[in-house]
Regions:
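Bacterial Sec-dependent N-terminal signal peptides
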Residues: 1-27
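Structural signature for solvent-exposed beta-strand/loop edge elements and short helix-capping sites
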Residues: 24-452
Length: 452
């Protein structure tokens, strides 16, 4: 085995040392003071003041250092700086394994990679060389922040596995862009080369999306924030934009309904699972599964709806651009004291027209507070005008039952019935009845029929 060759030259008190460990690898060292000692039988070179190690495009600076000759391991202390090409790592102290190109940095760690527009700060930073996409894996402990272009990632602990391009953020994890963010106790990030592909949050998930909207057409833009919470969350990305967000277990979301940059209202919805589809950062579709409940609060005169709308169902599907909502399985909608329920409900928010369909014995039903419900096989209802049409309608009044081929409802709570029947028999096909071609019902007052 070739023994290390040491060349020592004293120049105005500065010690220059050239240590050749092999034909391929060498350090060029300099310091104010140097001494060689043995620790546990290993030759160790100690350097003090203005320590400098140089190898090809790597430069390491420190106040003092110890070099373990056989394994080529550097122990660096005080104002430690490693420069590798354009990348710079600074810290209080560091252990560097030269043969492995691996480092363990401690105290006020700051790692800057200008070409990748990336900066990391932490308390403890351990990295090692890999043959993966980024060229190294790492472990960072202490309050850790990573800035990549305009994205900030932070956690008390961050691990990155370059082989699988997988990053794990533990304790107070967060990922934020200028207009959106995701938070949670623990977070897993999947990369596809340089691009963010997926984020999974497995506890106490929270996300937000900032919007600039107007309250008045000629007014100035104001900042609003959509918010989403759940136990677990999965976010998928396409071309650096979030494309889909899935909220699981006790999911809730608050989002703002927008009409051409004008705030139309605020929607709050909850359920077991919520799926939100985005396009370039804007919500395009929202699906709620499992005990879905919602509340829409209109903004001033920006919509024809002038008070809170409550709604729900086992499943809700809201298409934002089309302004359509589909509710199913125990679907209901309540507005200004009138409640409509059905197996399926389709709402057009642009026209405020509701279509309700009979599904699995869940009949379309409309009921005004204090009055008997009216039900039928299908229903069309105008939420604003409170006018509606019910096919094969049925209701009870004054201990009797009224049937009609079609029932038209006017506000306030007036029903016009075509081909009507009145009976005291509660069957859908009564044994006896009084019939009329037209009937007008005023609940709590009287019924007008002509001709009998």
């Amino acid at each position: 085995m070739e023994r290390p060759l040491l060349i020592i030259q004293f120049i105005t008190g500065l010690v220059l040392i050239f240590g050749l460990t092999s034909a391929q690898e060498r350090w060029i060292l300099s310091a104010e003071e140097m001494e060689s000692i043995k620790i546990n039988g290993q030759e160790v070179r100690r350097l003090n003041e203005n320590v400098r190690f140089v190898k090809t495009d790597k430069v390491i600076l420190a106040d003092n250092a110890a070099q373990y000759i056989k394994d080529d391991v550097l122990h660096l202390n005080g104002n430690t700086i490693m420069i590798n090409g354009l990348d710079t790592l600074t810290c209080d102290s560091m252990v560097y394994w030269s043969k492995l190109d691996s480092g363990y940095a401690m105290g006020n760690v700051r790692y800057i990679q200008p070409e990748k527009d990336r900066k990391l700060t932490t308390d403890v930073f351990h990295y090692w060389q890999t043959d993966g996409y980024r060229g190294s894996s790492f472990f960072a402990n202490g309050y850790t922040r990573i800035i990549e272009t305009n994205r900030l990632m932070a956690a008390n602990e961050i691990k990155y596995d370059d082989k699988f391009q997988l990053m794990i953020l533990s304790e107070n994890a967060s990922v934020e862009d200028p207009t959106r963010g995701i938070f949670g106790d623990e977070m897993t990030i999947q990369y596809a080369d340089s691009l963010l592909e997926m984020i999974y949050v497995n506890n106490n998930a929270f996300a937000y999306n900032d919007l600039n909207l107007k309250i008045e057409k000629n007014g100035s833009y104001q900042k609003f924030r959509d918010e989403m919470t759940s136990k677990e969350m999965i976010a998928h990305f396409q071309e650096d934009y979030i494309s889909q967000l899935k909220l699981m277990k006790m999911a809730t979301t608050l989002y703002h309904v927008v009409d051409d940059s004008l705030l139309a209202g605020e929607n709050t919805v909850s359920g077991d699972t919520i799926r939100i589809s985005f396009q370039e950062g804007e919500i395009k579709r929202l699906q709620v599964q499992g005990g879905a409940l919602g509340e829409f609060n209109p903004e001033g005169e920006n919509t024809r709806i002038d008070t809170t709308v409550f709604y729900g169902g086992e499943y809700i599907d809201y298409h934002i651009d089309e302004q359509l909502s589909f509710l199913s399985e125990g679907a209901f909608m309540e507005y200004e004291g009138t409640k409509l329920s059905s197996g399926e409900i389709l709402v057009n928010w642009e026209t405020n027209i509701l279509d309700a369909m009979l599904v699995n014995e869940e009949y379309p039903t409309v009921q005004t507070k204090g009055e008997s419900p009216m039900k039928g096989e299908s229903m069309v209802f105008d939420l604003v005008a409170k006018h509606g049409r019910i096919v094969k309608g049925k209701t009870s009044l004054n201990q009797g039952f009224y049937h009609g081929k079609e029932v038209f409802r006017d506000d306030p709570n007036i029903f016009h019935v075509q081909d009507s029947k009145y009976t005291s028999c509660d069957l859908d096909n009564p044994h006896f009845y009084l019939g009329s071609r037209k009937m007008k019902m005023l609940p709590g007052d009287r019924v007008i029929a002509k001709p009998l």
